[in-house]
Amino acid sequence: MLERCKLKILKGACGRVKLYIILVVIPAIVISFFVYEKEKDTIAAEHKQEASVLLNLHRNKINYLIGETMARMTSLSIAIDRPVDIKKMQSILEKTFDSEPRFSGLYFLNAKGDVTASTTELKTKVNLADRSFFIKAKETKKTVISDSYSSRITGQPIFTICVPVLDSKRNVTDYLVAAIQIDYLKNLINLLSPDVYIEVVNQDGKMIFASGQASHAEDQKPVSGYLDDISWNMKVYPNPVTIEELSKSLVLPLSCIIVLLNILFILVLYYLLKRQTQLERSENEAQKLELIGTLAASTAHEIRNPLTGISGFIQLLQKKYKGEEDQLYFSIIEQEIKRINQIVSEFLVLGKPTAEKWELNSLQDIIGEIMPIIYSEGNLYNVEVELQYLTEQPLLVKCTKDHIKQVILNVAKNGLESMPEGGKLTISLGALDKKAIIKVVDNGEGISQEMLDHIFLPFVTSKEKGTGLGLVVCKRIVLMYGGSIHIESEVRRGTEVTITLPVSAS
C-alpha cells in the first residue's frame, strides 16, 4: 500500500510536475539561497580586504606627508641664522612654498605671534597668538599639529604644523608655521581611490573631509585606523556588493546545482518507474497465482474423487487378473495414479496452504525422518549424500511437519536430478539470529541467470516432465511460516538453496 502511495505521483503530467517541484525546484531555491549568501559574504570579505589595503596605503601616505613636513620645518628652524633676516626668511619660505602644492601658506611668527614673513600677501597685520597650536607650542616648546580649522588669512580649510624656534638657551624666539590644505589631502586620496568612500574625522567625531563615492550604506561597517602624529581617524568603507558581481560569481555554481538536481530527478524518476513496473509485475503475478491457486484447488478436489474410485477398481482388477503382463500394466497404472495424486496435492497446497494444523516440530526430527528417502534416491542417481548438523541446539519450528518435509524433499530431488552422472549433495542445518537455516547444495548442472529470474513463477521449469509447480509450492509454504527461500546457482558449477525459518521457543 505504501509503495502504491509513493508511486501515485508518477501518474500523469501533474504528478511528474509535483515530483519535479519537490526534487528540483524547492531544493534549487533553498540551495541557491545559501549559495547566494555565501557568495555575497565572500565578495563582501574581499571588498573589506581591499578596503584594509587602501586604509594602510592612504594612512601611510598622509603619515609620510605630515612627517616629511615636520622634518622639513624642524630642519629649517635649526638652520635659521641669528639675528633673523626677515627678507631672507621670506625668500626661503617662498621657495619652499613654490616647490610643494600641499601648502596653503608658510609663515614666520615672532615670539608675540605676529606674522613677520608670509608666502601669502597680508593686507593688514596678522597675529596668531590666540590660536591653540601657538599657545601649546609656546608652553611645550615642541612641534604642535593643530586640528582642522578655517584659515583667517586664506579662508581655506587647513591644519597647521607649528615648530618653535629655540635659541641656545632653549628659549622660544620665533615660530615656523606650515599650513597644509585639507583639500590637497582629499584630492590626493580621491585621485588614488575615486570609487571608494573614505572619511577622516577628528577625535570628537567631527568630519574633517570625505572623498570617493558620495554615500555608503547605513549598516555598512568601515575599516578604520588612526594617523600617527595627529588624532584623526581614517575610515574606509568597503564597496557594497553589486548585482553584477553576484551574477558573475553565481552563474557557474547555480548552473551546476540545476544540472545536478535535474540529473537527480531523472535518476529518481527512473528508479520510481522501475519500482512501479516491478510492483505492477508482482501484483500481476500475485493475481495470476491467486487465480491459479483457486482454479487448482477446485480442480484438485474434482480430480481426487474419481481418482480414488479408479484406484479402488484397479486394486480389484489386480486381484482378479493374476497374469504377469496384467500385473505389469496395473503397476504402471498405479504409478501414474500416484503421480496424479502428487500433482493434485501440490494443487491443494497452491490453492489453500493454510488448511493444515500447525504444531511445534523439531527440524532435526523432520530431516531425520526424510533422510532415508533422500539416501535411497541418491543411490539411484549415484550421488553422495552428506548431512551436516551445525548446531546441537534443538531447532523447533511451528509448522505442519508434512509441509516442511515436502519442501526439503522437493529441493533435494531437484538437486539429485541435476546430477545425472553423479556428484555430491550436501544438506546442512544451522541457526543464526533466532532463525533456522537449511542449506541444500549440489555440484550439478546449475541454473542460468535467465531461469533464476523466473524460477519461482508458476509453470516455469527446465525439466521435460516437470509441472513447474514444485518451487512455487515450496516458496508458498516457506512464506506461510514466516521464512524465506533463496537460490544461488552457476551453470556447470552447482546450486545452493538456502531456506530460513523462524525458531520458536521450546
Swiss-Prot record:
Disruption phenotype: Cells lacking this gene sporulate normally in spo0F mutants. It catalyses: ATP + protein L-histidine = ADP + protein N-phospho-L-histidine. Keywords: ATP-binding, Cell membrane, Kinase, Membrane, Nucleotide-binding, Phosphoprotein, Sporulation, Transferase, Transmembrane, Transmembrane helix, Two-component regulatory system. The modification Phosphohistidine is found at residue 301. Coiled coil: none annotated. The keyword Kinase applies. It is an enzyme of class 2 (transferase). It is found in: Cell membrane. PANTHER family: PEROXIDE STRESS-ACTIVATED HISTIDINE KINASE MAK3 (PTHR43065:SF10), SENSOR HISTIDINE KINASE (PTHR43065). This is Sporulation kinase D. It comes from Bacillus subtilis (strain 168). The gene is kinD.
